């Protein structure tokens, strides 16, 4: 099978990867798959450095979307109360703490279908102020039209996160209030505004292996692949439609990380939700397969996260350093 990574693992162009090609790679013997993924990882990144990111929930709950996995959906039966948009100084204080703890990327998330005009001045102020601290900025605010994307770009936003979640085929089983095409439209608006794209998906929604492969093929075959690809493992949240979802096989999760690295060799592949359920050994395999970013802290939106102490211990044992640290 030819190595479709291109010269030095260059990213693929439109339509480059077929589902059949991706499936053949995914189904390689496990060691062969990881060997290929790790080789591309080394060509494009330092395998012993990782980016630490911090995610802050700047507006919690009350989202009108019906995403079956999300505790912040208004349809979730969990008693979560909607909050107002966080005060700017509180956001900045949390950003200072994140930077002091080693984060180089700061993501701000709001539980909205899309941001309203009245919220844009506060959002742009947050972006400008966080960037002034020397942090890379990211926001995830729901759908964006071209005008709002331009406003965020003008404020200096580095990344916008908007996951496609799963394959187009399986998507309607998870969400009915916004279409798969709506998500792709937002990604196009973000890209056209000159903001880098952060988009990935969630494993454990009830999807098949084919859906996981197709999700990654969709992302890899965008006009420009996302610079950032978060791979989430579902945390079943009480009160959501997927509260009793079956767990994901750990080795299948690692395979998805490896496939993401192969299809999008120049992208940051981010281990995001679900790490509290992952063993240290599973996370180590993910890093070997090409994951090179994680979210620090005790919480991730409304879900638990391993916390800085466990992460520091794991990275130290693996000899992996944060991007802000000086090599030993």
From Swiss-Prot:
Catalyzed chemical reaction(s): (4R,5S)-dethiobiotin + (sulfur carrier)-SH + 2 reduced [2Fe-2S]-[ferredoxin] + 2 S-adenosyl-L-methionine = (sulfur carrier)-H + biotin + 2 5'-deoxyadenosine + 2 L-methionine + 2 oxidized [2Fe-2S]-[ferredoxin]
Binding site for [2Fe-2S] cluster: 107, 138, 198, 270
Family note: Belongs to the radical SAM superfamily. Biotin synthase family.
Biological process annotations from GO: biotin biosynthetic process
Cofactor(s) recorded in Swiss-Prot or TrEMBL: [4Fe-4S] cluster; [2Fe-2S] cluster
CDD domains, sorted: Radical_SAM (cd01335)
Protein's pathway: Cofactor biosynthesis; biotin biosynthesis; biotin from 7,8-diaminononanoate: step 2/2
Protein name: Biotin synthase
EC number: 2.8.1.6
Gene symbol of the encoding locus: bioB
Xref: Pfam families: BATS, Radical_SAM
Binding site for [4Fe-4S] cluster: 63, 67, 70
Coiled-coil segments on the chain, per record: none
Keywords: 2Fe-2S, 4Fe-4S, Biotin biosynthesis, Iron, Iron-sulfur, Metal-binding, S-adenosyl-L-methionine, Transferase
Presence of keyword RNA-binding: no
